[in-house]
Regions:
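Short small-residue beta-strand/loop micro-motif enriched in glycine and branched aliphatics
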Residues: 36-39, 165-169, 211
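Non-catalytic protein-protein interaction segments used by genome-maintenance enzymes to assemble
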Residues: 47, 119-179, 183-190
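Nuclease catalytic cores
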Residues: 16-63, 126, 258-261
Length: 309
């Protein structure tokens, strides 16, 4: 088997979701194939909205003033400031409303027994981690915020989500691999932990209301997660060896929109993508240095065994 393009072995929670839904889309995404541009505006606003709300809530948890919080949101907003996704009720100004609602909840006592964990004098927000897997594969991730109970010293991960749905079903988040991956960060900060809580705080854009879901995660679940991650890597290697990433037609229409590769995915990969340049490869490798927590698969297994799982 030829060496795998470095762009294909840089994994994340979202890229693995794409791999599971449609391997061909995963391949084209990672190799930066050209996309259909029809829905770029709404997609960029949706992406910017989630980041702005997350940043605003993190800043509010740091006890910043409202002016400071809004400035942080403004600085992270990457779409046109006046752009709006009308269908999903997402814009910069609706993000401001979402964060102001959270600040009002805090004033009324929401999470009053919880405080941000600080590491080396910095708040544990947007903590980044990189897991070094076999054959050059890397799994990258971020933790929104780590909280500590002032009374019990219990540790909890705060995970911030937004949705345009009116109803939130717990099954959407209950077995999320993303939340299990957070154990990598908690292992680094609190080696003695045997389980931890994950609090999903979900803002519903159409109702303009928050809903929360809380789950307990154990290190037994992480043992299964490690094995599943290794299986995903083996699947990618198998696709590479076969020279085929299967197309999943059931994923061509999702979230009320056509896949951006709907008219091109059947074409030759060589015609759709360019070979990686030395400059691009170096940029990816240098980007690894920006992650705060690095851990190898061996470290992960040793930690797992020390917890008796």
């Amino acid at each position: 088997m030829n060496e795998i393009d470095i762009r294909l072995n840089q994994l994340s929670y979202s890229s693995l979701l794409t791999l599971h839904a449609c391997p061909r889309k995963f391949q084209l995404d990672r190799l930066q194939a050209p996309r259909e541009e029809g829905d770029d505006l709404s997609s960029s606003v949706t992406f910017a909205f989630g980041h702005a709300v997350g940043q605003g809530i993190q800043s509010a948890m740091e006890s910043k003033t409202e002016s400071q919080v809004l400035m942080d949101m403004f600085l992270i907003w990457e779409a046109n400031l006046l752009a709006e996704n009308e269908k999903q009720k997402k814009s910069f100004w609706s993000a401001v409303i979402a964060v102001q609602k959270f600040m009002a909840m805090r004033t009324q006592g929401y999470l009053e027994d919880w405080e941000l964990v600080y590491i080396d004098g910095k708040p544990a927000c947007e903590l980044s981690f990189l897991i070094h897997m076999p054959d050059g594969f890397k799994l990258r991730g971020f933790v929104d915020a780590v909280l500590r109970n002032k009374l019990t010293n219990e540790i909890m991960v705060l995970e911030l989500k937004t949705t345009s749905s009116y109803a939130v079903n717990s099954a959407t988040y209950k077995n999320s691999a993303q939340a299990i991956g957070y154990s990598v960060v908690l292992d680094h900060l609190f080696p003695e932990l045997s389980s931890y809580e994950v609090l999903y705080l979900i803002y519903k854009t159409k109702d303009k209301e928050y809903e929360q879901l809380q789950f307990t995660k154990s290190y037994f679940q992480r043992a299964l997660w490690i094995r599943e991650l290794l299986l995903d890597i083996e699947v990618i290697k198998m696709y590479e060896e076969a020279g085929i990433y299967p197309m999943r037609g059931e994923s061509c229409y999702n979230y009320f929109r056509e896949c951006e590769y709907i008219y091109t995915c059947m074409l030759s990969t060589d015609k759709l993508t360019d070979s990686i340049t030395e400059e691009q490869a170096q940029k990816i490798l240098q980007g690894h240095d920006t992650y705060q927590i690095h851990i190898t698969l061996n470290d992960l297994i040793v930690s797992q065994l020390s917890k008796g799982h």
